[in-house]
């Protein structure tokens, strides 16, 4: 990447829509409600032959430093400091508001090169807003429609004019594709990067994707900030600060990681606003594309019904869960509570028996190294593979000790087992009558597999297949 662009402006001028247009996918939540974006989101972007990082930011608001809008503004000011170029974005349809003038002055004082982006230029009445924009003193406004992809060639030329050709083009990375991205139709709303892989093409050099989930106000954003050692994500006492899933790249002892902060997940019955529905859906996508999911529980009120529903979703999706009992600094009798919580964990989540559960304090930093050790151990188990020879020796011993029961007077026969996949470990068991096999015996096989091959804390999939003789029927044909 050659440079970094921050998209700045008051709420609801279309910053996230422009961000999505530049990255070529619908990553940021977009809604008519002002203030949807709260954290700053960074992603690789492409504008014709220009390659750069783009930062989506919260809308600038004039507010006290200790308030939520004030803390959002502080995150935006960090983005201005990090950026090489500012896209100061206005709504040409509605024209200038007092906040546009106030924040234009802040951007001007930063001394950074600025491109004045007049968004929603396709709307009726936008011409008046375009003329007003000259009053900001930020140069010629570039008319665009982020929603429809209009005006992108002019935006590209404005970037080159602001930075100069040498800075704008810089040193191209090998093998990069110069296809036009910003004018294409946006498809999909996935949270994952395009490097999603299946079990057979897993590349250990790619960043491990870790989603951090939990109920509102459990301390998810604070935990990520504590892990990476900076105030990267907006935090505070208000529940529901995080709205869309924000990814943060991080290196832990040489291991590349991508952390996804997600919106707090409440019970469906309590979700009424469209924006919260969108936020939760965004979090669900983060889970589906993650490898590890850290479930953050508030240790002062752990194992609410919603916590268990979140854990069940993660297990059904086949992700590898790790539990973080957060706010451990508030606990008076930690040893007694830890023993109680671990017993509850085993009892309430039998599908992932042996799950890693670590007490942490995102506020003080206690337990974070142990949490990351648990993440790496769980990831290794989630990727584990057992040879067919070992599996069938195990099966032989299991059948001798505890054969499957008889059903309708006929004993079920289990003949062969092999591992079909990893991430999570999945096994195919050949048996005489798959439909008749009791689920209790399938659970027995799963628990025995987990214990015999040291696979604690991850979902194990077992598929039953018929063991029909492939040569059956030939004698009949000869007859």
From Swiss-Prot:
GO terms for molecular function: GTP binding. GTP 2 binds at residues 214-221, 261-265, 326-329. PANTHER family: GTPASE DER (PTHR43834:SF6). GTPase that plays an essential role in the late steps of ribosome biogenesis. Belongs to the TRAFAC class TrmE-Era-EngA-EngB-Septin-like GTPase superfamily. EngA (Der) GTPase family. Associates with the 50S ribosomal subunit. Gene3D superfamilies: 3.30.300.20, P-loop containing nucleotide triphosphate hydrolases. GTP 1 binds at residues 9-16, 56-60, 119-122. It comes from Mesorhizobium japonicum (strain LMG 29417 / CECT 9101 / MAFF 303099) (Mesorhizobium loti (strain MAFF 303099)). This is GTPase Der. Residues 3-167, 208-383 form the EngA-type G domain. Residues 384-468 form the KH-like domain. GO terms for biological process: ribosome biogenesis. Keywords: GTP-binding, Nucleotide-binding, Repeat, Ribosome biogenesis. PROSITE patterns: G_ENGA (PS51712).
């Amino acid at each position: 990447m050659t440079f970094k662009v921050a998209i700045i402006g008051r709420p609801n001028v279309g910053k996230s829509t422009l961000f999505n247009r530049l990255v070529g996918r619908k990553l940021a939540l977009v809604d008519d409600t002002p203030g949807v974006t709260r954290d700053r989101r960074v992603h690789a972007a492409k504008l014709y032959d220009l390659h750069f990082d783009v930062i989506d930011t919260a809308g600038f608001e004039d507010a006290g430093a200790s308030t939520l809008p004030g803390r959002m503004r502080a995150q935006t000011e960090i983005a201005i400091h990090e950026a090489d170029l500012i896209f100061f974005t206005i709504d040409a349809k509605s024209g200038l508001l007092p906040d546009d003038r106030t924040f234009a002055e802040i951007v001007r004082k930063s001394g950074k090169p600025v491109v004045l982006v007049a968004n929603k230029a396709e709307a009726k009445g936008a011409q008046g807003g375009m003329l007003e924009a000259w009053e900001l003193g930020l140069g010629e406004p570039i008319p665009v429609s982020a929603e429809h992809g209009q005006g992108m060639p002019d935006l590209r030329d404005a970037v080159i004019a602001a930075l100069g050709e040498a800075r704008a083009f810089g040193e191209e990375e090998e093998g990069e594709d110069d296809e036009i991205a910003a004018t294409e139709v946006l498809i999909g709303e996935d949270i994952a990067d395009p490097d999603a892989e299946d079990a057979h093409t897993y590349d250990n050099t790619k960043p491990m994707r870790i989603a951090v989930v939990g109920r509102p106000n459990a301390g998810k954003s604070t935990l990520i900030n504590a892990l990476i050692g900076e105030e990267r994500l907006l935090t505070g006492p208000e529940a529901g600060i995080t709205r869309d899933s924000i990814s943060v790249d991080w290196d832990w002892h040489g291991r590349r990681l991508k952390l996804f902060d997600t919106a707090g997940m409440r019970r469906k019955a309590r979700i009424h606003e469209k924006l919260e529905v969108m936020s939760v859906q965004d979090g669900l996508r983060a889970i589906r594309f993650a490898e590890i999911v850290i479930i953050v529980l508030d240790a002062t009120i752990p194992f609410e019904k919603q916590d268990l529903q979140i854990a069940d979703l993660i297990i059904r999706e086949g992700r590898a869960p790790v539990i973080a009992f957060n706010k451990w600094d508030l606990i008076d009798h930690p040893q007694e509570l830890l023993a109680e919580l671990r017993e509850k964990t085993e009892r309430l989540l039998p599908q992932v028996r042996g799950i890693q559960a670590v007490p942490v304090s995102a506020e003080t930093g206690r337990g974070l190294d142990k949490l990351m050790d648990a993440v790496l151990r769980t990831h290794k188990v989630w990727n584990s593979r057992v040879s067919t020879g070992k599996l069938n020796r195990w099966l032989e011993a299991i059948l001798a000790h505890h054969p499957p029961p008889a059903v309708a007077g006929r004993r079920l026969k289990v003949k062969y087992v092999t591992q079909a996949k990893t991430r999570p470990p999945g096994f195919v068991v050949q048996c005489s009558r798959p439909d008749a096999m009791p689920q209790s015996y399938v659970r027995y096989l799963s628990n025995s597999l987990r214990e015999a091959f040291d696979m604690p804390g991850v979902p194990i999939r077992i598929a039953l297949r018929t063991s029909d003789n492939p040569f059956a029927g030939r004698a009949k044909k000869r007859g």
